Regions:
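Conserved N-terminal phosphate-binding loop of PLP-dependent enzymes in the Aspartate aminotransferase
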Residues: 2-446
Length: 446
């Protein structure tokens, strides 16, 4: 007989109107002014439980929502809900205790998102930790490469990266992220080599910018011989401003990495799992990395690796406990992720993201033609964005979209607005979002 103390009747029924007050009593709660209704919300319709207001979601939980809210293949499938509840009752340590649900997830992940060139998988909870472990792969690899070549194995301590990058907020990643001083100031960081990001933007000679960045990279390799373990980059810089790069730049960085015995790592935490119209953004760039960090839409975060990693026979994927965590991700997330990936596969949502993204970008081109304030419409798949004249103007537009149009958007970079809808978004829903943006731009002037 259970002796657990149960709450008195009604104590568990916290009114939605009190949510922000309860949270603010113990933590900073400065997010959206709504209370997500976990039952009433559907697809890209996010409902405020306080008053029933429905918002059109172009935010997608920071690009982590793959199918939108309460997709029927999950919410209306009794067998799946039972499976999910069973997995949620306990939290086994996946790193050492294996289960059928875990194996089904890994098998599905490899089938739907896997790359035969990157056969090694490692799962962990959080995109930052995914990047951290990608870096640990490179640190270990470079040290062993140095040792095998008769060089000092203590060398191999630096990471080459780009300006305006976001790779996380803890540990090693704090030394890479440089989008917003608020997120990194006053925290100790490593002085690692940073090169200018030669992204495509109006008025820039991008080939000249690439040459400058490549010269900086060559100088970094020369200044730190055999000490740079990898070059890490987002294929499209997300938080930094939806910055796109030419494939030629990454191809030449790959050549530099080969020349100087360093790995190439892509951080696809935001760009991965179909958002750009392919499983991974790098598949549109003609360059296969040695390690890929993933997260957000995949629900379970982690890394895929292969390529030059396997040139070291005792790499971290072969030596027990070199990289590890208690839960190795999260079994409940794995069950949900497996079903999400099955839906993505069955409904061909990655192909759909590409087609819908083409339509969205065309609408954004039209928006730029109609409004002088809108510049640089850009995107791959559903990962699209525009730029406005100032940060203040952008902020007013985003606020009015939420308050008047009931559309949720997210800022990007200093002056941009980004689209991050779920893969299930329809053309009609994208049109509704762009129409709301059109009306708002007509009403809110720079």
């Amino acid at each position: 007989m259970s002796t657990a103390v149960r709450p008195a009747a009604g104590d568990s029924d916290l009114p939605a109107g009190r949510v922000h007050d309860v949270l603010r009593a113990h933590m900073l709660a400065d997010g959206f002014d709504l209370v997500l209704d976990l039952e009433a919300s559907r697809g890209v319709s996010v409902v405020d439980q306080r008053d029933g207001t429905a918002y059109l979601d172009m935010f997608g939980f920071f690009a982590s929502s793959a199918l939108g809210m309460n997709h029927p293949a999950l919410a209306d499938d009794g067998a799946f809900r039972h499976e999910l509840a069973t997995a949620a009752i306990n939290k086994p340590s996946n790193s050492d205790v294996y289960t059928v649900p875990m194996a089904r997830f890994v098998d599905t992940f490899a089938r739907v998102l896997g790359d035969p060139a990157l056969p090694h998988l490692f799962f962990v909870d959080g995109g930052t930790l995914a990047v951290e472990n990608a870096l640990k792969v490179a640190f270990d690899w470079k040290s062993r490469r140095n040792e095998a070549a008769g060089r000092d194995p203590a060398r191999g301590t630096r990471v080459l990266h780009l300006t305006e990058a976001f790779h996380g907020r803890s540990g090693y990643t704090l030394s890479l992220t440089n989008t917003d001083p608020t997120k990194i100031a006053r925290f100790p960081k490593f002085d690692w080599p940073r090169i200018d990001a030669p992204y495509l933007t109006d008025g820039r000679d991008v080939e000249q910018a690439e040459e400058r960045a490549l010269a900086q990279a060559r100088r970094a390799f020369a200044d730190h011989p055999q000490d740079i373990v990898c070059f890490v980059a987002e294929p499209i810089q997300g938080e930094g401003g939806d910055h796109h790069f030419r494939p030629e730049f990454f191809a030449r960085m790959r050549e530099l990495c080969l020349e100087h015995d360093a790995l190439l790592i892509f951080d696809e935490v935001q760009t991965g799992c179909g958002l750009t119209g392919t499983a991974w953004a790098y598949q549109q760039l003609g360059v296969t990395p040695d390690v890929v960090a993933f997260g957000k839409k995949t629900q379970v975060c982690g890394i895929m690796a292969g390529g030059r990693v396997d040139e070291v026979h005792d790499n971290v994927f072969e030596v027990s406990s070199r990289i590890n965590s208690t839960w190795g991700g999260n079994l409940t997330d794995m069950v949900r992720a497996r079903r999400i990936l099955e839906v993505i596969e069955e409904d061909r949502l990655i192909d759909r993201a590409r087609l819908c993204g083409t339509h969205l970008l065309r609408r954004l081109d039209d928006l730029a033609a109609a409004h002088d304030a809108v510049t640089e419409p850009r995107g791959r798949g559903l990962m699209c964005a525009i730029t406005l004249p100032t940060a203040a103007h952008r902020d007013r537009v985003v606020t009015r979209l939420r308050e008047r149009e009931h559309v949720l958007f997210l800022a990007t970079g200093e002056r941009g607005i980004r689209f991050r809808p779920p893969l299930t978004v329809t053309i009609a829903e994208l049109d509704a979002a762009v129409d709301a943006l059109d009306r708002t731009l007509a009403a809110v002037h720079p």
